[in-house]
Amino acid sequence: MISKIFEIVHKHQKFISGVCISKTHTKTAMCQVKRLYFDKGKYSALNYKTTKYMIHDPNDICAVGDQVHFRECAPVSKRKAHVVEKIVKKNPITEFLRQNPQYIVTPKEIAERKENDKIKYKHITDL
């Protein structure tokens, strides 16, 4: 009953749609929102403005590349005042890697490959 009342009260809150660009902290995601605007400058062109939001992700369901809907809420921290509502579209690369873990490459493997790919120069006297 109380949840229905809260749904009615918060119905006026608009959702913001964006893409998750960073997930370095627990329960926090950085989302980027692109907005189209008309630039009335010399050439009168349509341009995009991007805004970054730190959003609260209480269940840690976001991943980098996901399209999410989020809304305003009471401030959770100094820079976080938005909360995730739902994930609209999952990142297809993340889903593929989750289903096929054999393709995941660790930073240690990358460093080893770089070391093996280096050209090993020898002095002429060593030949």
Swiss-Prot record:
Keyword flag Transit peptide: yes
Manganese as UniProt keyword: no
InterPro entries (UniProt xref): NA-bd_OB-fold (IPR012340), Ribosomal_uS17 (IPR000266)
Gene Ontology CC: mitochondrion; ribonucleoprotein complex; ribosome
Name of the protein: Small ribosomal subunit protein uS17m
The organism of origin for this protein: Dictyostelium discoideum (Social amoeba)
GO biological process, one term: translation
Family to which the UniProt record says this protein belongs: Belongs to the universal ribosomal protein uS17 family.
Chief place of localization: mitochondrion
Cystine bridges: none
Molecular function via GO: rRNA binding; structural constituent of ribosome
